[in-house]
């Protein structure tokens, strides 16, 4: 049973870590493109800034969904409850 808990902890770490890496890369690329486009056309800064913040929120929402799934696996793990139900007594 300890090996399953170890693998669950590893999976939770991977979910959160890779999600954070992906979100930070996505927001970094988006911010760079925002700066390029606002330098090219300064009259569109207000429209571009609004769209950039909406997209940043969507990117962060995907990461937070991953965090919620990792927390579900960490605290309300369906695999461990199934394992405990099927263990011989």
From Swiss-Prot:
The chain crosses the membrane at residues 3-23, 53-73. Keywords: ATP synthesis, Cell inner membrane, Cell membrane, CF(0), Hydrogen ion transport, Ion transport, Lipid-binding, Membrane, Transmembrane, Transmembrane helix, Transport. It is found in: Cell inner membrane. One of its GO terms (molecular function) is proton-transporting ATP synthase activity, rotational mechanism. Coiled coil: none annotated. F-type ATPases have 2 components, F(1) - the catalytic core - and F(0) - the membrane proton channel. F(1) has five subunits: alpha(3), beta(3), gamma(1), delta(1), epsilon(1). F(0) has three main subunits: a(1), b(2) and c(10-14). The alpha and beta chains form an alternating ring which encloses part of the gamma chain. F(1) is attached to F(0) by a central stalk formed by the gamma and epsilon chains, while a peripheral stalk is formed by the delta and b chains. This is ATP synthase subunit c. It comes from Verminephrobacter eiseniae (strain EF01-2). The gene is atpE.
